[in-house]
Amino acid sequence: MKFLWAALVVTLLAGCQADVEEEVKLGQEPDRWQAKQPWEQALGRFWEYLRWVQTLSNKVKEELLNSQVTEELKLLIEETMKEVKAYKEELEKQVGPIAQETQARLSKELQAAQARLESDMEDVRTRLAQYRSEAQAALGQNTDDLQGRLASHLRKLRKRLLRDAEDLQKRLAVYQAGTHEAAERGVSAIHERLGPLMMEGPLQAIPPSQQLRERAEAWGQKVRGRLESVGSQARDRLDDVRDQMEELKAKVEEQASQVRLQAEAFQTRLKSWFEPLVQDMQRQWASLVEKVQSSLGISPSTKPSKTK
């Protein structure tokens, strides 16, 4: 039980440190995606295309008004996911005598990381499609506000994309290392079992302490994997909430500006309505006073004399 609590504390502390390091990495994005495997090269092409879109040059603005950009991104997403799948299948072919439970866990974590990366890439394409619709609706008007919001969203999506791409890269490395380690462990176990049989005859049983150690290592890996998964999900949810709050703030500010403009327009309209009415009432009152004075024989320009 003490070992469990110690493992949890160490893992949580490591997670906190990883969050700090992650913010530093996101603040210092690399000039280009360092590509080694085919899937990384495909992702690099998506990455470079996104950087070009973020410039929001006149050429980009022109192509954003049609479906060319989103179609290009769709092809790049399909190419990247195809290469990731091919690389994963290549690793699976290299799997040696690995425990079924370990393989299932590693495969599940890898699929989750792959799904997050694909979702990030699709979010970029969806946001650009949304901008195209908004820009076409506001054609002929000032679109600086739309471009500002698009640039802000693309920066956030790019950070999330970088983080999840690095996570997928690490998961693939762990999967590859796990298969190699399992294969080496399987070959070593065969040698340990067959060696004494060939030299001495009887098979030697695996020491109980070794079995306990292997079980403890497997249990530790399982706990660490679950904690990493929970931490990643929590960070994703926090990012989503932060993005939603910023979008809500922008919408509230926009609606407040619209309400203020509508109130000013309504005030101007009310003034235009009531000014003629007030002027007409003043004219009618002056006419009434003049008639009363005329009926009483009082000249409007003559002041009444004082009685002695």
UniProtKB/Swiss-Prot annotation:
GO cellular component: chylomicron; extracellular exosome; high-density lipoprotein particle; low-density lipoprotein particle; multivesicular body, internal vesicle; very-low-density lipoprotein particle
GO molecular function: cholesterol transfer activity; heparin binding; phosphatidylcholine-sterol O-acyltransferase activator activity; phospholipid binding
Keywords on record: Chylomicron, Endosome, Extracellular matrix, Glycoprotein, HDL, Heparin-binding, Lipid transport, Lipid-binding, Oxidation, Phosphoprotein, Repeat, Secreted, Signal, Transport, VLDL
Chain intervals for the UniProt region annotation (Homooligomerization): 257-308
GO BP terms, alphabetized: acylglycerol homeostasis; cholesterol efflux; cholesterol metabolic process; lipoprotein metabolic process; melanosome organization; phospholipid efflux
LDL and other lipoprotein receptors binding: annotated segments: 153-163
Highest taxon listed in the record's lineage: Eukaryota
Signal peptide: 1-18
Major subcellular site: secreted
Chain residue ranges for the region called Specificity for association with VLDL: 269-281
Family that this chain belongs to: Belongs to the apolipoprotein A1/A4/E family.
Name of the protein in question: Apolipoprotein E
